[in-house]
Every structure is written in C-alpha cells, then in structure tokens.
From Swiss-Prot:
A GO BP annotation: photosynthesis
One Gene Ontology molecular-function label: isopentenyl-diphosphate delta-isomerase activity
Source organism (scientific name): Clarkia breweri (Fairy fans)
Active site residues according to the UniProt entry: 142, 207
Nudix hydrolase domain sequence ranges: 105-257
InterPro entries found in the cross-reference section: IsopentenylPP_isomerase_typ1, NUDIX_hydrolase-like_dom_sf, NUDIX_hydrolase_dom
Pathway entry: Isoprenoid biosynthesis; dimethylallyl diphosphate biosynthesis; dimethylallyl diphosphate from isopentenyl diphosphate: step 1/1; Porphyrin-containing compound metabolism; chlorophyll biosynthesis
Protein name as catalogued: Isopentenyl-diphosphate Delta-isomerase I
Amino acid sequence: MSSSMLNFTASRIVSLPLLSSPPSRVHLPLCFFSPISLTQRFSAKLTFSSQATTMGEVVDAGMDAVQRRLMFEDECILVDENDKVVGHESKYNCHLMEKIESENLLHRAFSVFLFNSKYELLLQQRSATKVTFPLVWTNTCCSHPLYRESELIDENCLGVRNAAQRKLLDELGIPAEDLPVDQFIPLSRILYKAPSDGKWGEHELDYLLFIIRDVNLDPNPDEVAEVKYMNRDDLKELLRKADAEEEGVKLSPWFRLVVDNFLFKWWDHVEKGSLKDAADMKTIHKL
C-alpha cells in the first residue's frame, strides 16, 4: 500500500470514529447482530475506507462529517415498485441520481406527520448540512428504515414504525417511550422520484405515518434547523410563500405531494379521531 493510501486510510479512521459510534449505527453485513471484536471493527474500517476510495468519495470532502458518515454507514432497503424487498444499498448510492437513473434504485422510506393535542402539525426545516434538500421545510420526520432485522418486519408495518421511533429520537430528541410504536398509524404509501441538484436526489417508496401525541422536543442541529407547529391556516400561508418564492421558503417534494393529494382531508380525520378509517395500505400511489 502506498504512503498516500496509508495517509488517506488513517485520515478516514480518525474522521469517522466507528469505535465510538452507537451500536444502532454499526451495520456490518452478516454479523451486525453478533459481538464484534476490536480486530473486526478495525478491519471493517479499512474496508469502509477502501469502498469510499473506490466510489470517489474524495470529491465529497466538503460534505459535513456527520452526514458523510451516515451516507456510508446506513444501508437502505431496496424494493421494487410493489414494495417487495430486493436487496440493500448504501444511503450514498441510493441518493446518487446517476445510480437512480442507471440502475433504477428504489428504496423504502417513511414520512411521519406528528400532531399535538391541539391538532397542530409539527414541521421541521432540514439543516443546512443535509445532502439532499437542505433548508427546505417538510413534515415532522422523513427518513429510511435500515436493512436490519428490527426494521425489515413487514407485519403491521412494524419495521417502518420501529425506524420512525428511532429517527424521531435522533432528529428531534423525542424519547422512544413517548412514541409507542403501536401509536403510529400507517395511512398509505407513495412512490415518487425527485432530483435535489445535479448530483443528488430521491427515489422512494414512502410510508406515510400519522401520530397524535404531545411531546417534548430537543432538535439535533446536525439534522434540523428549525421546528414549528402549524395549524391549517399557518400551513396554507407557508404554501403561499413557497409558491411565490417569498423569504426563500422551499418545501420538500414529498411533503408537497402529500399536501396536494392527501393532507387536508386526512387532517379532518385527525380532528374527528377517525384516522384509521382513512388508511389504505393496499394502494401504492405513483405520484
């Protein structure tokens, strides 16, 4: 191995501290449910560094360190257009438009819509360091179930619910005990594709999860720039600003699709306590 490669590998090990990462963020093929020795962890880091070099990640040196780590640690669930699991791939590859277009990579995702007891919807503005759609306003939490046993459970959408509980803690600091998985109500699924810029984008089969809870928030600045509860009129004003391009307001494409096609009629069910009557998990809406 050349000295330059050794220096690059060492720099990756220093900048991406896998040994200190929480267990939930260590995803190693075939063995991530077994104890991992220090030797195995070190070997995994070398492999990780090699993969990053192969994929040309050097050109992304300006990417935020936290987001870069998640891009390679997180393994998304690949599905076909009928939501059948067909494999897994790094978050990095799943969001490269080149890969999306050339290999038709489609991954499973979820979007949480959390309402408080006043039936106000919690929105977040994505952080400036997000790789896709930075600083756009969107629903409460948008992310991906990972290719791990607990988040691959299809029965009653349990895998996706588990993932939603995990990410609401990670992004908004909401403890798991405040968001019981059985309180998430899956309403439907959408399939969409949306470029973010010339390099990155989304191609997702997205589960839409609603929940009504009063919660305490402690947003993670690596993920979230701002949070705000909105009633219907507040949201309509936000939509108006986005349409008029006022104050730099932008909305995520998946949130706008849900707003335009479903949200306000589902909001009626939120207020009536009849959300389960609106559920249709048999249909995948191609938007």
